[in-house]
């Protein structure tokens, strides 16, 4: 058996790369692209300080609190009201600048090397006692990205491979994951010929390749079947083994032999210790694509009807934000009708007064009903187009609301009265009163719905009880008279 062929670590894409990336690569540097939003600076700092971009909002708020504490130091760099500047900085639609970068360097006790296009970088020393260094790339548009050395890329590729393999081996319990990754990414490995290593019972335990690589074969007791019908799997069902011919071939090996892939190539690249993928960027782009396609609110400033957010009612008190549910959005997206949870009423507010909830309070929408097949396949990382063929049609107006009630949802019982019905006056025959139907205060009020309004009774019930029904978008009201026995139930509107 020959020696193992060594592979060099590489990034995900090698073709059609940016000239700036090639310039940095020749100098043993790698630029990790960030999502093009206003939180790019805080994503970069969160990744290099906390090893994850998911804490970018917490890093933003730590920066705001630090600048508020050291206001004597940073106020002279801000033109205008400093408190208003910090208030806007706390919102995710406000981009960070060099001023915030300097504040976070003092906060986390780090100096920084700032790279620009076709520049080797300049060292900015905030304090000689700071031992650690941030490597940040900044373009002319004020967008920030992470710069890594090739040694960091090699280490990150190994850590990424270990994380994905733990997920697919120990959580999903797929058989022969290493073999599948090699089969999908390096098919030439198996063209030179293979051999099997057997144990004392005659079972194949390892696959040996001519280039020196070997792959441990899993046993059916510790894995689950990949086939749709596990009863037809000869690996996990020994009674179907045809004279031992396919007994040692796992369902993973059977799929590969039939030119079927068990998971996507992106997942296979993530499990390769010689490749580094920008998983955060691809995941964020995929999440935004699905949100645009299915009309899903993901907790940003692209609000949808039914989304829970925060509203600023008093322009003089920006620190007071009330929780609300968006009921409707006009076509120009300048005014929104919201239901104030604290006050229990509907209010028309400008769209600029709405702000998303903090990430720790935001609850993602459950849109499994809109793409059940796609959600099931994404759990296993498979590439399938079955979800797109289930009748899902992309929303032609993604800015409008999805046809679903806002969360949380009670048990709404709306009653519609047609506007063409002529007014009815005078007493009618007696009928047994029913339980009054109260409109749900959180529901989206549509044209034609009405609200029961009745004056409270002070004394004994009169001979005739009048109930007024206010019909929206109609020039009249309906008055119904009922007999006094039994007395009609009282009903008060929450509006």
UniProtKB/Swiss-Prot annotation:
GO terms for molecular function: deubiquitinase activity; K63-linked deubiquitinase activity; serine-type peptidase activity. Residues 395-404 have a biased composition (Pro residues). Residues 375-404 are annotated as: Disordered. Keywords: Apoptosis. Pfam families: OTU. Residues 302-364 form the Tudor domain. Residues 29-150 form the OTU domain. Gene3D superfamilies: 3.90.70.80. It comes from the Eukaryota. InterPro entries: OTU_dom, OTU_OTU, OTU_Tudor, Papain-like_cys_pep_sf, Peptidase_C85-like. Residues 375-389 have a biased composition (Polar residues). Putative OTU-type deubiquitinase. Catalytically inactive towards all diubiquitin molecules and long K48- and K63- linked ubiquitin chains in vitro. Potential modulator of apoptosis. This is OTU domain-containing protein CG3251. It comes from Drosophila melanogaster.
């Amino acid at each position: 058996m020959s020696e193992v062929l060594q592979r060099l670590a590489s990034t995900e894409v090698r073709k059609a790369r940016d000239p700036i990336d090639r310039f940095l690569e020749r100098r043993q540097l790698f630029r990790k692209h960030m999502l093009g939003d206003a939180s790019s600076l805080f994503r970069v700092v969160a990744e290099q300080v906390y090893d994850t971009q998911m804490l970018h909002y917490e890093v933003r708020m730590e920066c705001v609190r630090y600048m508020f504490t050291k206001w004597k130091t940073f106020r002279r760099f801000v033109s205008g009201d400093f408190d208003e500047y910090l208030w806007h900085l706390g919102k995710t639609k406000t981009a960070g600048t060099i001023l915030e970068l300097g504040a976070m360097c003092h906060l986390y006790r780090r100096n920084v090397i700032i790279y620009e296009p076709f520049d080797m970088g300049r060292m900015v020393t905030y304090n000689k006692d700071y031992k650690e260094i941030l490597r940040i790339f900044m373009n002319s548009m004020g967008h920030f990205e992470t710069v890594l050395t090739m040694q960091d890329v090699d280490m990150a590729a190994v850590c990424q491979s270990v994380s994905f393999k733990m997920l697919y081996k120990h959580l999903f319990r797929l058989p022969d994951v290493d073999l599948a990754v090699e089969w999908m990414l390096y098919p030439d490995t198996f063209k030179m010929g293979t051999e099997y290593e057997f144990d004392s019972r005659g079972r194949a335990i390892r696959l040996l390749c001519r280039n020196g690589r070997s792959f441990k074969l899993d046993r059916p007791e510790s894995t689950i079947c990949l086939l749709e019908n596990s009863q037809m799997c000869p690996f996990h069902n020994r009674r179907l083994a045809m004279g031992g011919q396919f007994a040692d071939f796992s369902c993973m090996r059977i799929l590969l032999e039939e030119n079927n892939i068990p998971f996507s190539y992106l997942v296979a690249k993530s499990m390769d210790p010689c490749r580094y993928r920008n998983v955060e960027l691809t995941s964020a782009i995929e999440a935004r694509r699905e949100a645009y396609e299915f009309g899903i609110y993901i907790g940003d400033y692209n609000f949808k009807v039914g989304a829970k957010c925060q509203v600023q009612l008093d322009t003089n008190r920006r620190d007071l934000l009330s929780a609300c549910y968006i009921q409707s959005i006009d076509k120009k997206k300048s005014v929104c009708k919201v239901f104030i949870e604290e006050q229990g009423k509907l209010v028309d507010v400008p769209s600029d007064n709405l702000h998303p909830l903090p990430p720790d309070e935001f609850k993602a929408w459950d849109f499994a009903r809109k793409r059940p097949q796609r959600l099931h396949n994404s759990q296993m990382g498979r590439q399938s187009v079955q979800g797109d063929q289930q009748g899902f049609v992309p929303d032609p107006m993604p800015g409008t609301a999805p046809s679903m009630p806002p969360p949380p949802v009670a048990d709404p019982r709306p009653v519609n009265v047609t506007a063409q019905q002529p007014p009815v006056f005078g007493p009618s025959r007696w009928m047994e009163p029913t339980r009054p139907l109260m409109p749900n205060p959180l529901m989206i009020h549509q044209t034609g719905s009405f609200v029961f309004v009745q004056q409270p009774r002070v004394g004994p019930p009169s001979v005739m009880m009048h109930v007024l029904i206010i019909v929206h978008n109609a020039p009249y009201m309906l008055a119904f008279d009922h007999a006094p026995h039994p007395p009609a139930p009282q009903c008060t509107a929450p509006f």
